[in-house]
From Swiss-Prot:
Cofactor note: Binds 1 [4Fe-4S] cluster per subunit.
Catalytic reaction annotation: nitrate + a quinol = a quinone + nitrite + H2O
CDD domains linked to this entry: MopB_CT_Nitrate-R-NarG-like (cd02776), MopB_Nitrate-R-NarG-like (cd02750)
Residues that hold Mo-bis(molybdopterin guanine dinucleotide) according to the record: D223
Bilayer topology annotation: Peripheral membrane protein
Assembly and binders: Dimer of heterotrimers each composed of an alpha, a beta and a gamma chain. Alpha and beta are catalytic chains; gamma chains are involved in binding the enzyme complex to the cytoplasmic membrane. Interacts with the NarJ chaperone.
Protein name: Respiratory nitrate reductase 1 alpha chain
Stored InterPro entries: Asp_de-COase-like_dom_sf, MopB_CT_Nitrate-R-NarG-like, MoPterin_dinucl-bd_dom, Mopterin_OxRdtase, Mopterin_OxRdtase_4Fe-4S_dom, Mopterin_OxRdtase_prok_CS, MopterinOxRdtase_cofactor_BS, NarG
SMART domains associated with the record: Molybdop_Fe4S4
NCBIfam families the UniProt entry points to: narG
Amino acid sequence: MSKFLDRFRYFKQKGETFADGHGQLLNTNRDWEDGYRQRWQHDKIVRSTHGVNCTGSCSWKIYVKNGLVTWETQQTDYPRTRPDLPNHEPRGCPRGASYSWYLYSANRLKYPMMRKRLMKMWREAKALHSDPVEAWASIIEDADKAKSFKQARGRGGFVRSSWQEVNELIAASNVYTIKNYGPDRVAGFSPIPAMSMVSYASGARYLSLIGGTCLSFYDWYCDLPPASPQTWGEQTDVPESADWYNSSYIIAWGSNVPQTRTPDAHFFTEVRYKGTKTVAVTPDYAEIAKLCDLWLAPKQGTDAAMALAMGHVMLREFHLDNPSQYFTDYVRRYTDMPMLVMLEERDGYYAAGRMLRAADLVDALGQENNPEWKTVAFNTNGEMVAPNGSIGFRWGEKGKWNLEQRDGKTGEETELQLSLLGSQDEIAEVGFPYFGGDGTEHFNKVELENVLLHKLPVKRLQLADGSTALVTTVYDLTLANYGLERGLNDVNCATSYDDVKAYTPAWAEQITGVSRSQIIRIAREFADNADKTHGRSMIIVGAGLNHWYHLDMNYRGLINMLIFCGCVGQSGGGWAHYVGQEKLRPQTGWQPLAFALDWQRPARHMNSTSYFYNHSSQWRYETVTAEELLSPMADKSRYTGHLIDFNVRAERMGWLPSAPQLGTNPLTIAGEAEKAGMNPVDYTVKSLKEGSIRFAAEQPENGKNHPRNLFIWRSNLLGSSGKGHEFMLKYLLGTEHGIQGKDLGQQGGVKPEEVDWQDNGLEGKLDLVVTLDFRLSSTCLYSDIILPTATWYEKDDMNTSDMHPFIHPLSAAVDPAWEAKSDWEIYKAIAKKFSEVCVGHLGKETDIVTLPIQHDSAAELAQPLDVKDWKKGECDLIPGKTAPHIMVVERDYPATYERFTSIGPLMEKIGNGGKGIAWNTQSEMDLLRKLNYTKAEGPAKGQPMLNTAIDAAEMILTLAPETNGQVAVKAWAALSEFTGRDHTHLALNKEDEKIRFRDIQAQPRKIISSPTWSGLEDEHVSYNAGYTNVHELIPWRTLSGRQQLYQDHQWMRDFGESLLVYRPPIDTRSVKEVIGQKSNGNQEKALNFLTPHQKWGIHSTYSDNLLMLTLGRGGPVVWLSEADAKDLGIADNDWIEVFNSNGALTARAVVSQRVPAGMTMMYHAQERIVNLPGSEITQQRGGIHNSVTRITPKPTHMIGGYAHLAYGFNYYGTVGSNRDEFVVVRKMKNIDWLDGEGNDQVQESVK
């Protein structure tokens, strides 16, 4: 207590002490304690967590008093770790600790809301039409009425509605759209199911039952690293954060661990007490640098150059000059380095072609099953073998898809030969593309020949067709690509680290600005540690590298380093990519629930990047051409057209999905086929070949082939992840926008070849936008209907993360406040109303669904050699081979509600599975009938019920091997049939363990090891990706079955990326068009625009939270270097404007010496609804970080039908990169709040 009264003569406290002076007797008033107790007393504590995409997945105590949440604190009862590991707790962060503020704040959505103009028209239409579908038609078919409420989007004007009214309007709109245009014109976007998997499943299940389109998120967010599927055939699999503690050398490369992985950062600091060295690699002085022994600051966007130089050192010192036995054995057994590659003859030199296959050779090396998909190598005896494990062994035969060192024909043990040097027939000159001399004036270049000729040892082989071919190994190609001289007098190879040749440390020094001595030192230390510890060197990596256009080059650079050093699959080592809470651990139990696979298959999925690139018409403004992306050795005549042309070709060849799919209502095709006397599949094939049916993507703006209804839930699409924000406003929403640039027609640019061009792009494509949220976000402002959802303390759900092995509950500590409902209850009610409204319009319908060639299915062996396009007459249209699968799905629309609320019969008829393996689920269905009870009548009679979110959670937990030991054993047994090795021992000790929802409410539960992931959870090892591949000899799901360094698909070769290369950031050409055009009298400068993850929010969540705003600056900010700020006359906290041809934004300036000159940082997802004045450029309220971005897709991410390069939802596809973007920065002159309240000001310029 305060002793301020002790200073006065007549006011004295008792001064007696006790306990040797540690205690004191006081007589002060203690009434204050009553207030303290009243504030902090509570009636109960409930366990929950935060369903936000932060990867934390922390367990929290939610304190409830009088039916209200009063506060939250961190739980500390995680299951114990091994004796040699620190505990997982404390887990939490300031953002999570502030969440209870939202529940009763002014930001909270309390009631269903509808745009006033739309409500007025809807009520008038209902008065005239008794049928809700006809009422909706009367509005949306009237162009003036539709335009009037679409143009109001983003301007407020919401009024309170009722659940009955909004559900009826939504259902009527869905029924109208399906009936007139097709179910694939109804779409939904929701990200990261792992953060609240039942809530995600609620909307996805509804959409899938009606045939709607579920949009991807991992690729759209640019969280997906395409290098992972390219190398491992795996979307992403990474170590848990506890495995950091097992490492003895860690590089944190572009990952700001203490800021963006706050709950896990203690492992990073704790491992340093063991002597582990830590290195930070970031262009700015980020918080991670404070926790490290060394900080390297390469120029932003040049990370691949530094990784190449480090790889150069590792290969020189640990593979050539002083070979590590461990490294050599590792790359021989677990990589494609021994595999043979055919060389193609060019003008005076050779180029690396595709991998040699058994089918290329006489008698196919004795392989009868899939010989064109079996890779070939020489063994150390000089014999050619097709070793076990390649993708051809996975499908069509059993028992040889493993990494045992055996000949695939004889089964005899064999050791593969890494290099042909010493046994070659001749030395050949092979060309390698070089891009290090490309780029803009903002990045350093090293001018060399654009085709570098290297000398390689080769052998000449007789092929099955009688011709001969030269071959070399991937190992030899890799050494040459890295510029390593091996006594072959190769003038383009380096003899010293000081040679400025690709890709030496001296070369990288000129590109990155990092000294060659530092590059050499870190590479040497990293590899030496890995050699001595057998792989305990780790790279933690994140969005800093993954958000660039050539992100796969950045990532493959790091992955190659790890592979060269034998780190992948070893505890304490490997690739630790953390961008997004991607790990939905009980995935195989969740998928049937989410996509209604228990009732009908397949679901409609779409990759969001291609979807939004097309339908928000961003392609109309494209400035990047395929020609500038191609290898100098490619035949450019094969790659003509616009970038969207490549996407369209990929769709029709079955590589990528489409949405909408066809240029006609898919519900009408079966009827037309019946009239023609054909089955629907044959009729569709015939119509596509004739051109009477076209892919919708070929005519995106004809008024029929665009999305019409969009659901958004668990997402702030227009306030966080929507790259090309202003284009979405104009073309999807039809409202006010800030686009400054001209489209291709206005520029006189090159028009697409595959897509019909219209001079005026179609605006306002979406008829209805429905958003579910607990707070009024930017997306809500642009919606037509807002539905109030329960917060994370008001609903039951589940949450998992890649950062730890636990599964956490979200629990309803209190009932949803006001009229809010959980996502499950909202979509259940919509499904019920839809089932009523559709009667008379939709009944039992036959839907034609196109499905791209799927990864982890036998169909991925579709196109083994060259790329052939059926539309160009290069091959026939064969569904599932040269084109998408064409599937027939029977839908029962009036039974939608009954199906939504029950588990369908397909789980018993077909079973369940994931990632290429399947198992029987009869016993699990029997258990679910007992747990959830069954439907007593109706279309789902006798099926287990899904009435509540807890019922849905129990379905996930019961069906998933990660939470049901019996299923885990069945899943491992199913995999054992493929590999010929027994893996069930990995789960037998957990066979009787079944995790229930009430179990995880009592305490977090650790998941059970499952074959659908590549790591193990047990007492002996922390989860580490690739562990089962290395230790259980389970192949990676790639062409070779090994870690794939060489990408031999024709597009990868022709775009110059079969091997790792450095590619500088692309030129988006978004600045030259606007700089100096709308001057306000202040200096302007072009700067690179980066959007790292922020400190005071998780994406946009918490960015409007008063507690977080108080800790930060209270609104949007942009960070500038001191040098750039000086040039521009900007002082700290000045209002600035950031703009380019895509749009404009306003923010406060943060001037800091931690930011290097030439770049600016606007921390990602600062809401546009807080403290934001108008833009001088647009005369509108300043935008968000994505107002100055636009998508540019990369053709190599469109590849499909090719083993590991095949489509899977969120697995592979185009990504939404944005860090190559440049903006113009200037100080604002007129600060206009656009509110008429007299707070505007003029900001004086600094001389």
